[in-house]
A protein has these predicted regions:
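Alpha-solenoid HEAT/Armadillo-like helical repeat scaffolds in large eukaryotic proteins
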Residues: 25-29
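HEAT-repeat alpha-solenoid elements in large eukaryotic scaffold proteins
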Residues: 1-7
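ASCE P-loop NTPase motor core, strongest for the SF2 helicase catalytic module
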Residues: 44-56, 70-310, 330-369
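Alpha-solenoid ARM/HEAT helical repeat scaffolds used for protein-protein interactions
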Residues: 10-14, 253-256
């Protein structure tokens, strides 16, 4: 990986015609057991992602020296880059389990994107507007992947296909809702959720039963308090609902969650950036540690120029640097963010129903009024 990193940095734009030959092998190393290899692979992948928008038909003349086989391979693998850079190009994904819901077209696109991330062991942030079905889309890929993994293990007995449980972490007010939604949309034949809640003694009993369930739903505080238990398990999916909660990477909660081991990591949030650009770094540090560099490197490269450009007293040079930093950050994170707002999908949404309910004031309310 060190040699490849040197090649990428040394060739710079000269490596663009060969991007497709490097991206998938680098992806494979991003899940390496060696942490140093993982970090170096993530660093290389980040460098390649920044160059991906340049890989288009306009540079096909660079393919001249390549053999016919390599040109054919490059043409076929460009489809991967198209899917990575534009979620709408993701191949249509057929769910392997029945879902008790009719997916709207934008929800199917969301599932297609989640399946693409799954196929290449990538991780991402689904940040649709509230009410567009982030939970349903997540349940679809969760149930389908669990079923496929189970079937593959039955057929091959491969160690890397052995069924693993998944974990959903969400605010305490949503844990019951998640269990309800899973049971509503998916048969217990495919997902058996465990509502992991209660006082310490009750949770200790639930830990003994956890192996009988393939999905655990718990709140952020409980996962933080019981991290010694959760960190010992290898999860298939780890989904953070309202994941912007970990926007401050220095909190005990964020540090605890980053100890979790999972094949696939997904964040659900309607607001990936709440206060400052640095919020995004913490989210990606959970998804793909090293992808946006260290916190200090991120601040130096992105946060500081962007903040300085927004100052009313900033110079034209600082404003230009801020725009360039924003564009660079956008290119780097765009493949791993999917956001649709209600205005984008109005044609898919049912008509709004408005009902008025009249309530009698209580005696106390009457006096106050």
């Amino acid at each position: 990986m060190h040699s490849l990193s040197g090649v990428i940095e040394g060739l710079s734009l000269g490596i663009v015609p060969y991007l497709v030959f490097l991206v998938v092998p680098v992806l494979g190393r991003m899940s390496d057991q060696d942490e140093a290899v993982r970090l170096m692979a993530t660093h290389c992948f980040a460098a390649l992602v920044r160059l991906m928008p340049l890989d288009s038909g306009a540079i096909d003349e660079a393919g001249g020296p390549l053999s016919a086989d390599l040109r054919e391979r490059r043409a076929s693998e460009r489809h991967f880059l198209e899917q990575l850079m534009n979620a709408r190009h993701a191949d249509n994904y057929e769910l392997s389990v029945p879902i008790n819901a009719q997916l709207r077209s934008y929800q199917q696109e969301g599932v297609n994107w989640l399946a693409f991330l799954n196929k290449y062991s990538l991780h991402g942030i689904l940040c649709d507007d509230m009410g567009l079905g982030k939970t349903l889309q997540s349940i679809c890929i969760l149930a389908s992947d669990h079923h496929k993994r189970e079937q593959l293990y039955k057929e091959t007995q491969r160690a890397d296909a052995k069924p693993l449980p998944s974990l959903v972490v969400c605010p305490p007010t949503l844990t019951g809702h998640w269990v309800y939604e899973v049971e509503k949309f998916v048969s217990s034949q495919y997902l058996q959720p465990l509502h992991y809640t209660g006082p310490p003694m009750e949770r200790a009993r639930l830990q003994e039963k956890a192996h009988k369930h393939n999905l655990v739903v718990a709140s952020y505080d409980i996962v933080r308090n019981d991290i010694d238990f959760f960190a010992t398990i290898r999860w298939n999916y780890c989904i953070l609902d309202e994941g912007h909660i970990i926007k401050n990477g220095r909190t005990k909660l964020a540090r605890a969650l980053k100890q979790l081991q999972a094949n696939h990591r997904l964040i659900l949030t309607g607001t990936p950036i709440q206060n400052q650009v640095l919020d995004l770094w913490s989210l990606f540090d959970f998804l793909m540690p090293g992808f946006l560099g260290t916190e200090r490197q991120f601040a130096q490269r992105f946060s500081r120029p962007i903040l300085q450009s927004r100052d009313a007293k900033s110079s034209s040079r600082e404003q230009e640097a801020g725009v360039l930093a924003m564009e660079s950050l956008h290119r780097q994170v765009l493949p791993f963010l999917l956001r649709r707002v209600k205005d984008d999908v109005l044609q898919d949404l049912p008509p709004k129903i408005i009902q008025d309910y009249y309530c009698e004031l209580s005696p106390l309310q009457v006096r106050i009024h």
